[in-house]
Amino acid sequence: MMEAKNIMENRLFNMMGSEVVSGFSCKPVKLVPDKPIMHFKTHIFICGDERCGGAHKNENIAADLRDVLKEINLANGETRIKISRTGCFGACRFRSVANIYENTKTNGFEANNNIWLRNIHKYTKEKWIELFTALAQNKSIDDLDFKQVPMSEPSTYK
């Protein structure tokens, strides 16, 4: 989770400088609709729906991965990796599934954009660190030992 900072009178502020609602770590008290989101190089979406989420046996996988990113200094800056839980991707048979989205408008690595990873519930902390480091260094995931969800060719549906 985005780390909230304790500043005077027990008020919390998130990394973007917004005061946080009591009981939350990043939800702003006042929504500023025109405020941009915090930069990220890579965004990883992790399926947290019934089947994939059940495979994790860890309800806090997204929060735990955010903590790992903080430990290895990839939670902010130019190489920031953002983690989000999602609903079903429709790829339950490959559980547990994650999708990598690279911010190709700025400094994302196109070769790693839209890669679907499978069986992520089997990843150790070290495996996650290997993935995060490769993404930050723009190493192709195709060249590493990360099992991917196979995609059919578009011609399959003609």
Label the model's feature ranges:
Residues 17-33, 57-76:
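Short, charged low-complexity linear segments at domain edges
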Residues 3-37, 134-137, 141, 146:
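N-terminal leader/targeting and pre-domain segments
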Residues 37-39, 76, 93, 110:
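A generic structural signal for short, non-catalytic loop/turn and secondary-structure boundary residues
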Residues 94-158:
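Short flanking/linker segments adjacent to small metal-binding domains or redox-active Cys/His motifs
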Residues 1-6, 49-67:
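Short, charge-rich amphipathic segments
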Residues 41-57, 82-103:
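Local cysteine-cluster metal-coordination motifs and their immediate loop/turn environment
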Residues 78-80:
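Feature captures the catalytic cores and cofactor-binding loops of soluble hydro-lyases/lyases
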